[in-house]
Amino acid sequence: MKETELWQRLRLHLGADYFRVWASEYSHSALGQRTVVEALSDGVPCKIIWRAVWAALELPARDR
């Protein structure tokens, strides 16, 4: 997964007005208590980040 796809998915599921705020403020235990933005900055693969987001948002399996 590319970073652009990660941001597209976040926008789709969280909305245009909220996805960037959520990505910079919500800490994920699956990412070592990092936010999406911090995890990206630390070089965590987008696929791993998306799995953490998918679980946190309790999205359906089809969106994994």
How would you name each of these model-derived features?
Residues 1-64:
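C-terminal alpha-helical interaction appendages
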